[in-house]
Swiss-Prot record:
Identification of the protein by name: Glutaminase
PANTHER family named among the record's database cross-references: GLUTAMINASE
Keyword Membrane carried by entry: no
Record note on quaternary structure: Homotetramer.
The EC number(s) this enzyme carries: 3.5.1.2
Classification via SUPFAM superfamilies: beta-lactamase/transpeptidase-like
Binding site for substrate: S61, N113, E158, N165, Y189, Y241, V259
MF terms in GO: glutaminase activity
Length: 305
């Protein structure tokens, strides 16, 4: 497996030159464009990694699957999906278009920024600090890493420059789609996106989902089976933003990307995969990371379709 991982990294390193690091969050623009790593965890609890698999980076939009799991556990799926849809979108992850066009003004799915902001508002807690504390502890639990923490520099950078997210949130507040104190909800959202992880952490989250919510290391149930099923399904349809259809055709496994360059993926009942490739394509997905997953999926016949 390690030889295969080394091969897929080297075969796809060339794609880095065609991407660029996220620039709209100043702190992310400082990232090394050439970082590339992968980690794989099997259902038997074996771990393999190559490249920059132990380099820390911020979770960004991958946190959306974390808060979605927590919100469903806290509120039940019927309530959560009465506030946010579950349909794919052809518009960008930070677009306001669908919020204006839809009669209900409900965000179209939980993987776009507007939807994730609504989901963050549904995480239980008396204030933003308690909500985020629960999100951080849950991230540590599902990854099996109690050392995971927030990158305060990225959090500050996001909070100071998150004007589009503020616009989305205040628009939803004006239509009644978002309940609660907007700045408190945004604070939770900016913090959750600034959690720092590695490829290894992502692979462990992926293998928990691949194992229907059960840790292959301890045998303990981490999340209810139905929650894991919902999240994996939404990862397939919406997890790679408006490139989700293309990803499903060419790679064919549940995955979620973030503009920090990470991708978490899972091959149900086989393995979890974490990838880091900081150079992004025009959709906001890791360009080399996506190509690595495509080659790995073909080599190991991972597609669920």
């Amino acid at each position: 497996m390690n030889r295969l991982l080394k091969t897929v990294i080297e075969n796809n390193r060339k794609w880095i030159s065609e991407g660029k690091v996220a620039s709209y969050i100043p702190e992310l623009s400082k990232m090394d464009k050439n970082l590339l790593g992968i980690s794989v965890c099997t259902l038997g609890g074996e771990e393999y990694w190559e490249g920059d698999a132990e380099v820390k980076f911020t979770i960004q939009s991958i946190s959306k699957i974390v808060t979605l799991m927590l919100a469903i556990i806290d509120n039940g799926e019927d309530y959560v999906f009465s506030k946010v849809g579950m349909e794919p979108t052809e518009t960008a992850f930070n677009s306001i278009v669908n919020l204006e066009a839809k009669e209900s003004h409900k965000p179209i799915n939980p993987m776009i920024n507007a939807g994730a902001i609504v989901v963050a508002s549904m995480v239980a807690g008396k204030d933003s600090d308690e909500k985020f504390d629960r999100i951080l502890k849950f991230t540590r639990k599902i990854s099996g890493n109690n050392n995971i923490d927030i990158n305060l520099n990225v959090y500050t950078s996001e909070k100071e420059t998150g004007h589009r997210n503020r616009a989305l949130a205040y628009f939803m507040k004006s239509t009644g789609a978002l309940k609660g104190d907007v700045e408190e909800i945004l604070d939770v959202y900016f913090k959750q996106c600034s959690i720092e992880i590695t490829c290894k952490d992502l692979a462990r989250i992926g293998v928990m989902l691949a194992n229907d919510g059960v840790s292959p290391y301890t045998g303990d149930r981490i999340v209810p089976r139905y929650v894991a099923r919902i999240v994996k399904t939404i990862m397939v349809t919406c997890g790679m933003y408006d490139a989700s259809g293309n990803f499903a055709v060419h790679i064919g496994i549940p995955a979620k990307s973030g503009v920090g360059g990470g991708i978490v993926a899972c091959a149900p009942r086989r393995m979890g995969i974490g990838v880091l490739g900081t150079a992004l394509d025009e959709k906001g997905n890791s360009i080399a990371g996506t190509k690595i997953l495509e080659e790995l999926s073909k080599q190991l016949d991972l597609s669920i379709f």
